[in-house]
């Protein structure tokens, strides 16, 4: 028994009294203290207490329903887009279409004796050539000849051949777009020949003479522009010969 008494004395702390067990225990108070001790308080994490009256307080809306308040200032267009629309170039300029240059190139082809501007002719402009190719095919269609495939195919092969030939002959070199542009603009006299084919038949002496004049007109204009743009002085005849072969094929399509 003495050992058992010593065990009880060692088990309990010296400040603990068995008589305290007889006192009543308030579960509600203890539970409230326990929940208060371990409850999560979101406002304590922010470092301060916010009174309830400040949480319920709202700023009154002083503006009207369909009108913003005076303090609202919309963002400027410059800050959103970086620059105004007035500073942007026109759409035709971004696409590389210049009607002034197109008109000057057309006049250069229509006037074979006019001096060509090498700076303008060296540009890659395919808007005018596409229009002239469509016009040439349309006039052939009016004459009862559906030859759009031949027109585009011969044009592509001719441009490729002239591109290779001019790069071999010139010192500066030339781009494929420049060759296509010049040959396309010089197709304009051939549209006149196909327009005559709509009115009367070209299978005769008059048609052959007219076709020869148109071929010489086209080849002379194309060679003049190539000589001016590529600085190939004294080589116009050498350039005009392959051009005459190309436009001769178009003349055969128009006549026959």
UniProtKB/Swiss-Prot annotation:
This protein's GO CC annotations: endoplasmic reticulum membrane; Golgi apparatus
Location within or outside the cell: Endoplasmic reticulum membrane; Golgi apparatus, cis-Golgi network membrane
Superkingdom of this protein's organism: Eukaryota
Regions that span the bilayer: 126-146, 148-168, 173-193, 196-216, 236-256
Bilayer disposition of the protein: Multi-pass membrane protein
Lumenal side: 147, 194-195
Coiled-coil regions, chain positions: none
Signal peptide limits: none
Biological processes, Gene Ontology terms: endoplasmic reticulum to Golgi vesicle-mediated transport; protein transport
Keyword list, A-Z: Endoplasmic reticulum, ER-Golgi transport, Golgi apparatus, Membrane, Protein transport, Transmembrane, Transmembrane helix, Transport
Name of a matching Pfam family: Yip1
Function summary: Plays a role in transport between endoplasmic reticulum and Golgi.
Similarity comment: family membership: Belongs to the YIP1 family.
Name of the protein: Protein YIPF5
């Amino acid at each position: 028994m003495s050992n058992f008494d010593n065990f009880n004395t060692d088990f309990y702390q010296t400040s603990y009294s068995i008589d305290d067990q007889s006192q009543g225990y308030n579960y509600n108070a203890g539970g409230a203290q326990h929940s208060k001790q371990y409850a999560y308080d979101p406002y304590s994490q922010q470092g301060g207490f916010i009174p309830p009256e400040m949480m319920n307080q709202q700023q009154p809306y002083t503006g009207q329903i369909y009108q913003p308040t005076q303090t609202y200032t919309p963002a400027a267009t410059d800050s959103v887009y970086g620059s105004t629309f007035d500073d942007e170039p026109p759409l035709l300029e971004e696409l590389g279409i210049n009607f002034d240059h197109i008109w000057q190139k057309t006049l250069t082809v229509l006037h074979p004796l006019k001096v060509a501007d090498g700076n303008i002719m060296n540009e890659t402009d395919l808007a005018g050539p596409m229009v002239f190719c469509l016009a040439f095919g349309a006039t052939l269609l009016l004459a009862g000849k559906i030859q759009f495939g031949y027109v585009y195919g011969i044009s592509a092969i001719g441009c490729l051949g002239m591109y290779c030939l001019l790069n071999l002959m010139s010192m500066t070199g030339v781009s494929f777009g420049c060759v296509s542009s010049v040959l396309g603009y010089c197709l304009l006299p051939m549209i006149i020949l196909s327009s005559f084919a709509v009115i009367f038949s070209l299978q005769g002496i008059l048609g052959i003479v007219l076709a020869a004049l148109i071929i010489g007109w086209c080849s002379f204009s194309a060679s003049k522009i190539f000589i001016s743009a590529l600085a190939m002085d004294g080589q116009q005849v050498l350039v005009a010969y392959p051009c005459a072969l190309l436009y001769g094929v178009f003349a055969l399509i128009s006549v026959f």
